[in-house]
Design a protein with these regions (language model features):
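Sec-dependent signal peptide cleavage junction
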Residues: 16-32
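Active-site- and interface-proximal helix/loop "cap" or "latch" segments in soluble metabolic
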Residues: 30-331
Length: 331
């Protein structure tokens, strides 16, 4: 009898083990979807007068954060960058064009925190350390990482980030608030591209000149094949003004918002007669990017810098070159 029961029990145990194993996660099973959002914090730090041979300056730091957030309210992934922009104008009221614009992250080692500032790590390395640190934290836990003088707590410093982090946190706070249901998941890679364009106008008689920049941010979750599964964007316009003597006429008390952040108050429908508001048109462009690689997005733009026929039919009639050039950088 024992000889019959023993083999039977062994077979039963084997079947049970296989059954339990089959109940686990299957190979290739898609991870749960995550919320996805982009936040931008803008800080104008200077608008000085020109004086003789010394040009006047307009300075602005635009900090962007993209995050994915799990069902538990914790940040699953985060990417950060800062567009640190300086424009100038002369004492004759002439705007000076910049050769190019690069974010702090794009500058890499050339930013020079190690070479010129004596820092142990370059800016992008410290940025990455902070972005890694916020993973797995709630928003309140992230906000608690800011200490005196806008620098990080000991936890932040020990992680390798000794730079000021307050504006990172302010951008993350906006990204968290903007996070919405998406097709992004933990298997995807979060990416952020930035493109800045400049337009200059000299002062003439009693008409102010301007040195204006428009910085477009394109954030995306990308799958293993490099295809976009979720996308969003923002654009910040900063217009530094001055008179024909190079004296700044920029209002430093003015609160700046991104075009998406401004919502309906941006006024494309009310004042420009557009069928859709800026954020609605941007959403139409972003939707057209789903399933495409960064290089394929360039095909969405025509020779006139507007969208192709499909983009226009989808409701995006604004210039899309900023979106396309920012998106190209996530490749």
């Amino acid at each position: 009898m024992k000889r019959i029961i023993c083999p039977f029990l062994c077979i039963l145990m084997l079947i049970t083990t296989i059954s339990f194993a089959a109940c686990g996660k299957k190979d290739g099973e898609t991870p749960p979807s995550l919320k996805f959002g982009l936040g931008v914090y803008t800080n104008v730090t200077k608008a000085s007068d020109a004086d003789g041979d010394t040009n006047g300056q307009g300075k602005v730091a635009i900090t962007a954060a993209a995050v994915t957030v799990g069902a538990d309210g914790k940040i699953a992934s985060c990417v950060l960058d800062v567009a640190d922009i300086t424009v100038t104008y002369t004492s004759e009221g002439k705007a000076v064009a910049n050769d190019s614009f690069k974010t702090k992250g794009e500058q890499g080692d050339a930013y020079g925190m190690k070479a010129y500032g004596g820092a142990a790590k370059e800016w992008y390395e410290q940025r990455d350390a902070f972005a890694s640190l916020v993973k797995g934290k709630t928003l309140e836990e992230v906000k608690a990482l800011v200490a005196d003088a806008n620098k990080g707590t000991d936890e932040v410093i020990n992680a390798g980030c000794t730079i000021m982090v307050k504006e990172f946190v302010l951008a993350i706070e906006k990204a968290y608030a903007n996070a919405a249901d998406s097709s992004a998941n933990a298997a995807n890679t979060l990416k952020l591209g930035t493109h800045t364009e400049q337009s200059c106008k000299d002062a003439v008689d009693d008409k102010n000149g301007q040195n204006q920049t428009e910085t477009t941010f394109f954030a995306a979750a990308v799958d293993a094949d490099g295809k976009i599964v979720a996308a969003t964007s923002e654009c910040v316009q900063v217009k530094f003004t001055f008179d024909n003597t190079g004296k700044s006429t920029y209002d430093m008390t003015k609160k700046l918002q991104g075009k998406r952040e401004a919502g309906d108050s941006y006024g494309m429908k009310k004042y420009g007669g557009a069928a859709k508001e800026w954020y609605e048109q941007a959403d139409a462009f972003n939707a057209a990017c789903i399933g495409k690689t960064a290089s394929e997005i360039s095909g969405l733009m025509g020779a006139d810098s507007y969208g192709n026929a499909d983009i226009k039919d989808a409701g995006c009639t604004i210039l899309v070159n900023g979106f396309v050039k920012a998106a190209a950088k996530i490749g």
